[in-house]
Swiss-Prot record:
One Gene Ontology term, aspect cellular component: plasma membrane
UniProt-annotated location(s): Cell membrane
Domain ABC transporter: 1-237
Gene3D superfamilies: P-loop containing nucleotide triphosphate hydrolases
Enzyme class: translocase
Principal subcellular localisation of the protein: membrane
Keyword hit for Iron: no
GO biological process: phosphate ion transmembrane transport
Protein's UniProt name: Phosphate import ATP-binding protein PstB 1
Binding site for ATP: 28-35
Pfam families: ABC_tran
């Protein structure tokens, strides 16, 4: 697939398979196209004037850019967690229940169950169970990011996209997010953009290296980090440029 912003070709001839129930890390220097590629996977680039995708991106064999695709339904299946925590200015409970309510769920007992299971899934329940109806803005940065993950889990996605989810967090919060990602891959396919080579090596099963809008190399993380085929991959991983 190719991505254009107007006449500018931001991504060139990208061909990449994302394995199910694995963590795939997208690495590369700033401006290489990895975040642009991530946003293609749930059509977030649709929100940018002049952006268009040529080629196909399939989820379970169906082209997500085909005419008539319900983009809201797609984004329910392919959730996204952004670089900086973005909780809504409402209670912790209402943040998590927001998605299910948008999709028509009104039964309190069902919402209660979704909220608890989503917060448990994001390893946050024990920290907030006694203050569910307090503002989410009172949480720490790391807690807010886990709340945003819980909010994504609440609509039962198949894929989770994460755009540098720990870059704005302290080391302890980052470690919790990384541990959570390792746990979540048993149930979800995860694609994560990261500038942190050590983080990519720790948490991912597969790694894809982007440079100047091209996919240079991808494969099992151990292979990419210890025996890359392309000299540019080795130069980036070893810090010769970036």
């Amino acid at each position: 697939m190719d991505l254009y912003y107007g006449s500018y070709r931001a991504l060139r001839s990208i061909s990449l398979e994302i394995p199910a129930n694995r963590v795939t890390a997208l690495i590369g220097p700033s401006g290489c196209g990895k975040s642009s590629f991530l946003r293609c996977l749930n059509r977030m680039n649709d929100l940018i004037p002049g952006a268009r995708v040529e080629g196909t991106i399939t989820l379970d064999g169906a082209d997500i850019y085909a005419p008539g695709v319900d983009v809201v339904a797609l984004r329910r299946r392919v959730g996204m967690v952004f670089q900086r925590p973005n909780p809504f200015p409402m209670s912790i409970y209402d943040n998590v229940a927001y998605g299910p309510r948008i999709h028509g769920e009104r039964r309190k007992a069902v919402l209660d169950e979704i909220v608890e299971q989503s917060l448990r899934g994001a390893a946050l329940w024990d920290e907030v169970k006694d203050r569910l109806h307090r503002s989410a803005l009172g949480l720490s940065g790391g807690q807010q990011q886990r709340l945003c993950i819980a909010r994504s889990l609440a609509v039962k996605p198949e894929v989770l996209l994460m755009d540098e989810p720990a870059s704005a967090l302290d080391p302890i919060s980052t470690a919790k997010i990384e541990e959570l990602i390792r746990e979540l891959r048993a149930q979800y396919s995860i694609v994560i953009v990261t500038h942190n080579m050590q983080q990519a090596a720790r948490i991912s099963d597969y790694t894809a290296f982007f440079l100047s809008g091209e996919l240079i190399e991808h494969g099992p993380t151990g292979t990419i980090f210890t025996n890359p085929k392309d000299q540019r991959t080795e130069d980036y991983i070893t810090g010769r440029f970036g």
